[in-house]
A protein has these predicted regions:
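Short amphipathic alpha-helix that is part of the acyltransferase structural core
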Residues: 1-47, 51-53, 189, 193-201, ...
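Conserved active-site alpha-helix within GNAT-family acetyltransferase domains
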Residues: 122-149
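C-terminal "cap" of GNAT-fold acetyltransferases
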Residues: 148-213
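A short, internal acetyl-CoA/4′-phosphopantetheine-binding micro-motif in the GNAT/acyltransferase core
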Residues: 85-95, 121-123
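Conserved acetyl-CoA-binding loop-helix of GNAT-fold acetyltransferases
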Residues: 89, 95-108
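Conserved GNAT acetyl-CoA-binding A-motif
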Residues: 110-127
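A conserved beta-strand-loop-helix scaffold within acyl/acetyltransferase catalytic domains
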Residues: 33-58, 62-82, 87
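Functionally engaged cysteine thiol sites
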Residues: 21-27, 86, 159-161
């Protein structure tokens, strides 16, 4: 008896569907329609924001979120640069190259981009968006980094934030980032390791390690 091949499809939830609630949620958190995310989507979707789900046999097992740099939730700037906010495939769906399938969906969708950028972490306690993963699995390279620590939790642990770059053309100019702005964290995604909690009164939730006595 021939084994049934898995049914795989990729769906863009920014175009409206039964999965549209995924604009406000991901695998790391339950559905929460928080205000900062709503405000961000109102600005970003008209400028080219995309969130796509990978559905395996009618179950959501992966996602990717990307946007032109000028509408990114990260302080990254660049000419015709696409910023990947996140990419994720559930562990139970590993081993089928589904992450690469999602990634190539972005590359194909944005073939005219000069290149692709993202942020990656090294020595951070979160397993998400690791530098080695971005390099080994998708071909990104680190073009700049800074070593910081969190001012609200795990305060003794330093980790690195890397600006990652994947040029799409030989003459592409690499992106730039605002390190000072990034010390404030990000507020467009509750699940992101660099998330700035709305309730904190501190403007900057990270500080550079070398500045600490």
């Amino acid at each position: 008896m021939t084994e049934k091949r898995p049914e795989v499809k990729i769906l863009d939830v920014t175009e409206g569907s039964e999965y549209q609630r995924w604009l406000y949620t991901c695998f790391a958190m339950s559905f929460v329609k928080h205000e900062k995310r709503r405000e961000y989507l109102v600005r970003a979707i008209p400028k080219g924001f995309h969130k796509k789900l990978l559905i395996l046999n009618d179950e959501v097992v992966g996602q990717i979120e990307y946007v032109p740099a000028e509408a990114s939730g990260f302080p990254i700037v660049g000419d015709n640069v696409i910023v990947m906010h996140c990419i994720w495939v559930l562990r139970k769906a590993k081993g089928h190259n589904l992450g690469k399938k999602l990634f190539h969906e972005m590359l194909e969708n944005k073939r005219s981009a000069s290149g692709f950028a993202t942020l990656a972490l090294e020595n951070h306690w979160s397993p998400w968006m690791k530098r080695w993963q971005m390099e080994k699995l998708f071909g990104f390279k680190s073009i700049d980094s800074m070593e910081v620590r969190h001012r609200l939790k795990q305060m003794r642990e330093c980790f690195e934030i890397h600006l990652m770059w994947l040029p799409n053309r030989s003459d592409s100019k690499p992106p730039r980032w605002d390190k000072t702005k990034l010390l404030e964290g990000v507020d467009f995604c509750l699940a992101h390791p660099l998330y700035h909690p709305a309730k904190t009164r501190q403007k900057e939730i990270f500080e550079k390690c070398q500045s600490i006595v």
